[in-house]
Structures are given as C-alpha cells and as structure tokens.
Amino acid sequence: MDSYEYGELLKELSTKRDNIAKIIKPDSIENRLGEIEALEHSEGFWNDATKAGEVQKEKRKLERILKKYEEANQAINDAKELFEIATQDNDEETLGLLFEESGHLEKEIKSVEIEVMLSGEHDGSNAIITIHPGAGGTESQDWASILYRMYLRWAERRGFKVEVLDYQEGEEAGIKDASFIIKGENAYGYLKVENGIHRLVRISPFDANAKRHTSFTSVMVSPEVDDDIDIEIEEKDLRLDTYRASGAGGQHVNKTESAIRITHIPTGIVVQCQNDRSQHKNKATAFKMLKSRLYELELAKRSAEYDSMEKSEIGWGHQIRSYVLAPYQQVKDTRSNIAYSNIEAILDGDLDELLEGVLISQFDQPGE
C-alpha cells in the first residue's frame, strides 16, 4: 500500500461512515436513550416485567450500535489527522504504521455495517429453518442433508441451541424434509440471507459412472414470531394431515399418527412437526411455524424485492448460491458476488464470513 491507495481507502471508509450516520442518526439514538433513562426512573416502570424487558432489549441494541459507530468514527478521524500530519512531515515510519493498521480500520467499519444490518425488528429472533430437496431423488436429498448438517454445525460453533421440529429421512440417503429452530442472539438476522435455492455441482457418490451431477435444495428461513403478533389464519384455508413420526434425526418412533402436517391452501405453504409424542403439542408447534412463514411472506410482499420477483420465485425461492465440488472447488454467492475456495470449511459450518459478505452487500445497495 502507498499514500495514494491509503488516501483513497480513507475516502471510501469516510463515505461508508457518513452513509451509516444517515441511516442510524446518532443524535436520534442519543435522544431515545435519554427517553429510556427517564422511563427507567418513572414510577411503576419496573412493575410491568414484559414491557420493561422489551425496553431494556431496545436499550442494549441502541447502545451497541452507537458504541460501534462512535468507535469507528473516532478511528477514521484519528487516522485522517495522523495521515495528514505524516504526509506533510514525510514521516515514513508513521505512514508505515498507518498502512499496517488499514485492515483494522476496515474491520471497524464492517462491524458497524453488520450491526446496522442486524438491527431489524425481528433480526434478534430465533430462526425457523425448513430444508426441502428439489427434483432429483437421492442426489438432491443427500444435498439437503449436507445443508442440514452445515446449519447445525454453524449453530454449534456459535453456541446456539437447535430444536428439531421435523425430519423426514430419504429412502436411500439424505432427507426428504427437515424443519428446525436455531435459538440464539441474531439467529434470524444472520440466517435470513439463506432464503432461496442452493445449487450443488459434484461427482455423484451414487453414480457408478462417476458423472458430474447438479442438485438443488430450497432453504426457507423465518423468524420465530411472538404469540402476540396478530396474523389471521382461517380454518377454511387449512388442510390438516396426520402421519407417523419417522424416527430419524434423533427423534422418537411411535405407532400412532402424532406427527402433523398443515397446508395453507391460499399460499401453498406446508409445515409439519413430529417433535413431540403429543399430537396436540405438534399441532401447536406447526401452527407457530405456519404463523412465522406467513409473517415472513408478508414482510417479503412489503419489500421492493417482491415487486421484481416472479410468482414462481416467491413459491420456490430463487438461486442464491452455488457450491461447486468438481471440476474445481468454489462457493459463490449471487448477491455479494464473492467466491470462496474453502468449501469444506463452509460445509462444516464456517459460515460467518459468507453471511456477513451478503449482509454488507445488501447494506451497500441503494435503497437499503
């Protein structure tokens, strides 16, 4: 890196800093924190534990965003001042130190961008994930099971809990369907970018001729919504089916039809649960899953992205990422347009860099 490149980097990071300020409005955050402090000292505030908890959650989020912004802002201002002085004095030693620290400066801004992208209304929620293989039988079902393991490993790496709701094992290998909840801070915020079609290209382990095969699997992610969110679901729009739990995925096997499948006829959304021995509990969980999916659909309808998507894409999703194992190894995301060569690590749950790359690419898009 030379002085020209560093100067250009400072301009780029300053622009990003200014864009962040326009979005988060630091002065407004400080005003809101002042209002919260006054609330905390008001009579009877702590008597309503639920309301107090919501306010405290908002406070922590605002404090975290403001702190990260202020740290990044200060770091850029300090770097600018030091760079100007060092350039005027031709201080090679200081310039060298600034160049070495440039990566840290970029990370400061990246950290704020990610924090902003995780500040949506439901980003802090748990994530309900449903994985469904595309056409292709065993090949696609095996790919679905690889993705299932990838998300479970990601959750494990972050110390998040996983609750399996439904797991339908494939006849030869893989899975026909899987639904599960990942429970942890910002689980939905991170995983919301996984909505869509995931494409795999590899030499098939199921092909005696060792030919290259392409498989597709759909991943659907929705926030675990609170019970108090009002989503109208009419009984006439539902079809309920019962079936026996399959016993795969560490779940129990039983001889009664305790598993529940609910089809929402107007949208075609299907949810199913076999997590519990009780049909009543499975039905309650399935309704919660349906509620989350309908809420996610409503959010999509409100977004500008919805207007540009075909109806077929809404129902099935759109291709978001390719995983190529042969003839070369690469994972490429269509949103961030970033390619990664560490495909084995990614499939083993090392997803943070990839997820953050998508979040930041969305932050940089006009209108985000």
From Swiss-Prot:
GO annotation, cellular component aspect: cytoplasm
GO molecular function, one term: translation release factor activity, codon specific
Top-level lineage group: Bacteria
InterPro entries referenced in this protein's UniProt entry, alphabetically: PCRF, Pep_chain_release_fac_I, Pep_chain_release_fac_I_sf, PrfB
PROSITE patterns: RF_PROK_I
One Pfam family, short name: PCRF
Major localization listed first in the record, in broad terms: cytoplasm
Keyword Cytoplasm: yes
N5-methylglutamine modification, residue list: 251
Entry PTM: Methylated by PrmC. Methylation increases the termination efficiency of RF2.
Record's subcellular location: Cytoplasm
Keywords on record: Cytoplasm, Methylation, Protein biosynthesis
HAMAP family linked: Rel_fac_2
Role noted for this protein: Peptide chain release factor 2 directs the termination of translation in response to the peptide chain termination codons UGA and UAA.
Family: Belongs to the prokaryotic/mitochondrial release factor family.
PANTHER family membership: CLASS I PEPTIDE CHAIN RELEASE FACTOR (PTHR43116:SF3), PEPTIDE CHAIN RELEASE FACTOR 2 (PTHR43116)
Protein name: Peptide chain release factor 2
Provenance organism: Wolinella succinogenes (strain ATCC 29543 / DSM 1740 / CCUG 13145 / JCM 31913 / LMG 7466 / NCTC 11488 / FDC 602W)
Lineage of producing organism: Bacteria, Pseudomonadati, Campylobacterota, Epsilonproteobacteria, Campylobacterales
Gene: prfB
